[in-house]
Amino acid sequence: MAAPRRRMGLEKIGLYDVGRAIGKGNFATVRIARHKIAKTKVAIKSIDVSALDRENLIKLEREVKIVKVIDHPHIVKSYEIMRVDNMLYIVSEYCSSGELYETLIEKGRVAENVARKWFSETASAVAYLHSQGIVHRDLKAENILLGKNSNIKIIDFGFSNFQTGDQLLNTWCGSPPYAAPELLLGNSYDGMKADIWSMGVLLYILVAGGFPFPSDSVNKLKRSVLSGLVKIPYWVSVECADFIRKMLVLNPGKRYTIQNVLQHRWMHIRDDVQKNQAAQLLEAIPSSSIEIRQQSTKLNPTIMMFMQQHGKWSEEQIIDAVLGRDFESPIFATYELLADKVKKGTLEGTGEEFPRRGSRGSILSGKANVDEQPLTPTISAHQLAQLNLSSPDCDSDDSSNSDLCDDSPMSSMGPMNHERQFGTPHGLDIIGNRFENRRHTLCASEQLLSPNMMGQFPPPNLLLNNFSMNPPLGFPPMPEGQAAEFPLPSLHPAFATIPIADLSKMLPVPKSERRASAGETLLPTNFDLTQHLANLPAPPISFPTVEEEGKSYLSKYGGKRNTVHCLGNQLGGGIQNPIPRYQRTPYTKAPPAERRSSWASPSLSAQQQNHLEKLFKQALQTNNDMTRLHKEFKGLSHGCAQSQITNEGSSLACPQISITDEYNRQHNIAPSASSFDPVSIFQKNAQEVVFGQRPATAIGFSSTSFSGMSTPEQTTRSIDDRVRSIVCTLPFTEVIDELKASLNILKIPFSESHEMVYEPQVTEMRRLSLPSGVEIGVAVLPPEHKAHVEFAIINNDSPTSEYLCDQLICRLRMIDPSWSSE
């Protein structure tokens, strides 16, 4: 046996034949292996202990301690811990479907019913960990595997830790895209609340197909996370969007707990079968490791007998190792692997423990005299076959060993889809699922049967098919009681002489396809639905009217925001209708560029302009009130343009009315004086100095300057004239203390407020408000450790306020010779 093992490249570690690597990390390598006695595939994580420092050694021992105490159906189960020289081996459950991340890369976002199933299983596992006082701290799609029947399995407890009560953690760990804001800021944090944030990011990825805070650097990620803005796509339901926002809350105290997650209404939108399965799952989860040991006190005698025959272990050794949960003993691992195999076989409906032979009503089932023999513990043939055969992952000995050393493209650690583009949402396609229900992608190939073999089978009888579908008038319908007398049409007396091919004896001819693991990827990995539909017979052409399409669309997507009936394809793009429609509808004469939106463009098309001018000329030609009002308006506007009527220093001009904020942005219109807010002006200017010039916001005003255009309420003095700013090289606190001392000397009362600016970066800011209408704001400049001081005058004409600002600025210049003006 040594020569074949060397030829196949298998390495022996304990009772395992170790094969190819399926994953690699900084200090560890994961390989696929096969247990000799249980004949089950497992995953072995090998770590070189000599290459680890003291901190990583502590984390490794903590991981070993955690995997020994956890046992949950949606957490990868560990079987054995082996220490050989400088190597540490962790034997765990093997999941053949790969990572959830690779599934999302291949198929894109999933439907909410699929996301609900996966997220519920993840939430149940996290709830179990938190009940044990364990925090994962590295929840992400790469650390979630898909097992049998697409069940979730959480892996990688390298960053996990124990947490009790209100204890806070300080270690920064995890992946930045999934990290909570308190971790990004380097503060002490609650590990359980950090897991909830990671779960919120995970759910967003499942339903949206992307990250909630996309960025290409850690600094940009911090700014995006600390802004608190989560943009959820329109196709996400209202309940799911609310659920995501409740988990992605910046304040950990207001963030959801795992109990709130399990009780959210989105988690309970499912049918009765799924509700019963979820309830049974939560009830079956043990709340502590003590209950796990109590459930395992009774051992399976069949497994013990099998282990005594194949492992040469005594009954006492098996009982001590299993009840003591000795992970460093091969006895415990062997028993657990065999017990899992028996459990899977029972759940899959393998039948009774002793299958019946014959019939209870047979005449041969009477009593018989049998000589009594001494009772000896034996293993039935069914149980022996169940334990001795390979697991569902291993077909046979040869196939298992060859799979361990498989170097085909499908066995590599790379993704199956090299384009890495999001495909059709998983769970939404109906026809595609019928063709993608196998793990391997199917490609075109030659037929299984040759033309000579196909010629040996008689052609199907068209007369028989016609008779089965539409019986002739000469044959009356057969009664229900006599239908079983003629199971095949060939047995009918009327068709006894007609040759009929027995299709049940023919070999099943598969489709023209083959596995992509052969190395010839002739077709893309994702099934092209359009090619399949092109081969189907064309249905009769019938084009629905616009009203019918509108009703159908609103019935499906009427609950979404910004949904408007009968929007033209020119606005939203999409697929144009290749065949024109000739139905008479109320919408056929509508202008093509017309749309119903508050963000409509102020410009008009040529068709609309001509139509409006035509209506205007027709209205002026008739001698009615419209003509008289038009002449009066022209006279008033002409008189106002020539005469200057002053009122408190402001010119009374014809106001320019802006319909939308987008129109203000295009014409660069400044806000009026009545809505002047010195606090907002100071925050904007302070952020421009601290973080540079910012682009124009969605409100519509430019970020640095204002236009000369004004409204009737705006004064002759601009906003920039009422705002003065300087930059001091003194520390932030000294500037605040100096300003407060100066105001106290002048006996001017003031009120102080402390604020934090979170966008685009967390910045500290203090504001001093004076009764005379002066607002003094001081902000921190993080890179240079300087202070940005800004004075804003609310009163338009107040010499006292200007004099006070000049005195305070002179005071700051005296104590700081290196000041600079803005």
Curated annotation (Swiss-Prot):
Disruption of the gene: reported phenotype: Defective in the expression of a set of chemoreceptor genes, and exhibit characteristics associated with altered sensory signaling, including increased lifespan, decreased body size, and deregulated entry into the dauer developmental stage. Exhibit defects in food-induced quiescence behavior.
Function as written in the Swiss-Prot or TrEMBL entry: Regulates chemoreceptor expression by phosphorylating the hda-4 class II histone deacetylase (HDAC) and inhibiting the gene repression functions of hda-4 and the mef-2 transcription factor, enabling the correct sensing and transduction of food signals. Role in determining body size, the dauer decision and serotonin-mediated egg laying. May modulate the Sma/Mab pathway and regulates development in the later larval stages.
Record-annotated Protein kinase domain positions: 16-267
Region (Disordered): 348-367, 389-423, 577-602
Subcellular location: Cytoplasm; Nucleus
Keywords tagged on the record: ATP-binding, Cytoplasm, Developmental protein, Kinase, Magnesium, Metal-binding, Nucleotide-binding, Nucleus, Serine/threonine-protein kinase, Transferase
GO molecular function per UniProt: ATP binding; histone deacetylase inhibitor activity; metal ion binding; protein kinase activity; protein serine kinase activity; protein serine/threonine kinase activity
Active site: D138 (proton acceptor)
Required cofactor(s): Mg(2+)
Gene label: kin-29
Pfam families assigned: Pkinase (PF00069)
Tissue specificity statement from the Swiss-Prot or TrEMBL entry: Primarily neuronal, with additional expression in body wall muscle and hypodermal cells. Among neuronal cells, expressed in multiple sensory neurons and interneurons in the lateral, anterior, and lumbar ganglia, as well as in motor neurons in the ventral motor cord. Present in the AWB and AWC olfactory neurons.
Protein name (database record): Serine/threonine-protein kinase kin-29
